[in-house]
Each structure stands twice: as structure tokens, then as C-alpha cells.
Amino acid sequence: NNIEGNGSDMVVPNMYVAEGTTSDLNLAYYFVNGENLTYTCTSGDTTVASVSVNGTFMTVSGVKTGATRITVKVSNGSEQSITVTVRKKANDNGWM
């Protein structure tokens, strides 16, 4: 049970994505009261990976082999950056 006003944000994990595929992550799991927040995500290099947000879900699309930073900004003022690595082969859950 979550006690109102308690808790702390968790670290959003780095991700692996295969070229031409997508991987989803529910951001609400990583921020206190996450289901009540809004999220904005940006990719440092959209030629490597693009990112979109639908509700609490972040979708990362692998464009070409390489690595880039994805920045997650949250309506409560929190911000985290992760590394997304795109490889020719990775499975659909982000693991190699």
C-alpha cells in the first residue's frame, strides 16, 4: 500500500531496441503517483531512435544502429535521462 506523500521516484531503465521495432515502457511505475502525471519525452538523436508518449506509456522506436539519450520530463518537475541502444538484433522486450 502506498501512503500518500511518501515514496520516491525509481530510476527509469536504459533500453535496448532492435532496428525497425518498438519497445514500450509504462512510466507511471517509475514516478510517485505516476498514474496522475503527464510525460514529455525527447530523443537526442531521432536518426537513431524516436520516442512518443501515449498517456503513461513511452514508445521507443529503433531507427538505426547506435545509441542516444532519451529525456523524460514529468509534470511534477522531475526529469530523467536514459540511454537507448539500437542494435540490429534485440528481442521485443528490450533485451538482447
Outline where the language-model segments fall.
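Extracytoplasmic soluble-region selector
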Residues: 1-96
